[in-house]
C-alpha cells in the first residue's frame, strides 16, 4: 500500500492530489490518504471534500508516544532555532502516530506532497522503523522553511514541479540529481476540454483568473492592466474566482479604477464552476509575483480548455508555455506589457484561436494526470525497489 501525505487535506487548492490518488487506484495501487491535521469543514468547496475527509487518517492530534529516536533527530536540526525545535516535539508525536498507522494498515511507502514540516514527520517516522518515503517540492525551497538536508537525507527520491526546482535542490541541498524527477501534478484533460466557441468579436475580450486573493498572486497588476486596455478602446471584462485576505484591497482598487462594471469577484468556486468559467472565457491571466509559484495547476486547466494565457514569468511557467506559441510570457509586475497582451488578444481573435489550440495540444501532451502519475509511480518504484501495483513488477523512468 502507498500512503499519500498532504498537509491539512483537503484544502481548496488540493484537487490535484485527489486526481493523483484516483489515477493511482486506476493503475492498481492500493492508496491510503494521510494528513497532518484536519482543516476547517468549509476549507474546500469541491465535491470530493467530504469523501476525502472520510478517507483520510490525520496524525494530529496524535494517539501515542515512544519516539525517543525521533526526538534525537529533531534536536540535531542545524538550521532550526532551539525554541522552534522544542515546539517541534508535537511533530515527534505525529511521527509516532504515523508509524503505528502504517504498521496497522500495511503502508509500505509514504509519498509526501510537501517539503515543510510534513517532511520532518515522514523522516522521523522512517527513523522509528516506519516505511520508506519520498517528497514532492511544490515551490521554491525558502517557502518551505529550513533544514531541507535533514528532511531529504533519508528520502528514497524526490519529485518537483519543474526543472528549476531540481536545480535548487541539487544546488542548495546537495541531493543526488539522478534521484530527482521534475514532474507536473497534472489534470484530467478529457474533463478540462474546450467548448465549441466562435472566433469572437474584434475589440472584445473576456479574461479569467482562478487563484487565491493573495498579494503574491499579483491581481492588482492585472486589474490595472485591464484599465489600460479599456482606455485604449478595448471592451475587456475580467472575472476572478478565488477568495483570500486581499479581497478588500482588490475591491478598493476596482472602485478606484472605475472598473466595477468590468471586473467581477466570484469568490471560491468548485471544480465544475471553474470549468464553466474557463469555457466561457477568451483568455487566462496569471499575474503572480515573487516566490512560491511552481507549476500552476490553474494554468494547466486553462490551457487544457484551449485558452491562451497571459502569464507572469515565474516558477516553471517558461517551461509550461512558449511565448508567442501557447500564450504570452510577461515580466512580473509589468502592467504595460500585460495591457499590451490584452489589447492584442482583443483586437486579433484569430490569434486567440491559434494560441488556444496550441495550448490545448501542449496540455494534452504534457499535463494529463494519468501520464504524470504513472511517471511518479515508476520513479518511486525504481528508487525503492518496491512493486506497489497489485500484480505488477517494477518499471524504470529517467529523471
Task: Tell what function each PLM region has.
Residues 279-293, 307:
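Acidic donor-binding loop of glycosyltransferase active sites
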Residues 251-269:
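Nucleotide-activated donor-binding/catalytic signature segment of Leloir-type glycosyltransferases, i.e.
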Residues 146-147, 170, 178, 187-203, ...:
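Acidic anion/phosphate-binding donor-loop and adjacent secondary structure
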Residues 323-324, 328-335, 344-349:
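Conserved acidic donor-binding segment of nucleotide-sugar-dependent glycosyltransferases
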Residues 308-311, 321:
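Short hydrophobic beta-strand element within catalytic cores of glycosyltransferases
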Residues 164, 186:
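Carbohydrate-associated surface elements
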Residues 268-269, 276-281:
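Short alpha-helical donor nucleotide-sugar binding micro-motif in glycosyltransferases
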Residues 196-227, 239:
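Conserved donor-binding/catalytic core segment of Leloir-type glycosyltransferases
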Amino acid at each position: 500500500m502507498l500512503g499519500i501525505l498532504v498537509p491539512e487535506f483537503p484544502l481548496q487548492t488540493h484537487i490535484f492530489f485527489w486526481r493523483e490518488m484516483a489515477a493511482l487506484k486506476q493503475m492498481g495501487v492500493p492508496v491510503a490518504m494521510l494528513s497532518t491535521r484536519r482543516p476547517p469543514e468549509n476549507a474546500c468547496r469541491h465535491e470530493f471534500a467530504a469523501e476525502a475527509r472520510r478517507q483520510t487518517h490525520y496524525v494530529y492530534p496524535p494517539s501515542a508516544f515512544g519516539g525517543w529516536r525521533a526526538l534525537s533527530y529533531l534536536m540535531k536540526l542545524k538550521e532550526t532555532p532551539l525554541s522552534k525545535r522544542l515546539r517541534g516535539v508535537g511533530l515527534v508525536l505525529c511521527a509516532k502516530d504515523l508509524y503505528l498507522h502504517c504498521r496497522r494498515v500495511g503502508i509500505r511507502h509514504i509519498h509526501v506532497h510537501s517539503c515543510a514540516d510534513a517532511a520532518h514527520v515522514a523522516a522521523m517516522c522512517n527513523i522509528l522503523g516506519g516505511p520508506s518515503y519520498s517528497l514532492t517540492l511544490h515551490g521554491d525551497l525558502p517557502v518551505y522553511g529550513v533544514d531541507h538536508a535533514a528532511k531529504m537525507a533519508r528520502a528514497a527520491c524526490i519529485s518537483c514541479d519543474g526543472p528549476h526546482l531540481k536545480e535548487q535542490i541539487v544546488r542548495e541541498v546537495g541531493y543526488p540529481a539522478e534521484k530527482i524527477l521534475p514532474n507536473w501534478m497534472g489534470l484530467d484533460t478529457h474533463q478540462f476540454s474546450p467548448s465549441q466557441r466562435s472566433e469572437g468579436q474584434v475589440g472584445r475580450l473576456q479574461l479569467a483568473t482562478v487563484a487565491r486573493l493573495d498579494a503574491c498572486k499579483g491581481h492588482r497588476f492585472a486589474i490595472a492592466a485591464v484599465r489600460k486596455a479599456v482606455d485604449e478602446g478595448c471592451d475587456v471584462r475580467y472575472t476572478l474566482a478565488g477568495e483570500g485576505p486581499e479581497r478588500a484591497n482588490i475591491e478598493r482598487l476596482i472602485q478606484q479604477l472605475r472598473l466595477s462594471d468590468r471586473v467581477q469577484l466570484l469568490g471560491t468556486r468548485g471544480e465544475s464552476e471553474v470549468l464553466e468559467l474557463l469555457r466561457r472565457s477568451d483568455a487566462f491571466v496569471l499575474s503572480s509575483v515573487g516566490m512560491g509559484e511552481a507549476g500552476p495547476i490553474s494554468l494547466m486547466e486553462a490551457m487544457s480548455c484551449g485558452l491562451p494565457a497571459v502569464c507572469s514569468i515565474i516558477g516553471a511557467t517558461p517551461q509550461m508555455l512558449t511565448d508567442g506559441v501557447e500564450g504570452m510570457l510577461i515580466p512580473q509586475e509589468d502592467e504595460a506589457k500585460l495591457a499590451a497582451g490584452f489589447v492584442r488578444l482583443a483586437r486579433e481573435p484569430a490569434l486567440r484561436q491559434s494560441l488556444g489550440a496550441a495550448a490545448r495540444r501542449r496540455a494534452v501532451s504534457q499535463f494529463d494526470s494519468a501520464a504524470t502519475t504513472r511517471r511518479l509511480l515508476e520513479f518511486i518504484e525504481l528508487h525503492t525497489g518496491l512493486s506497489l501495483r497489485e500484480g505488477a513488477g517494477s518499471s524504470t523512468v529517467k529523471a
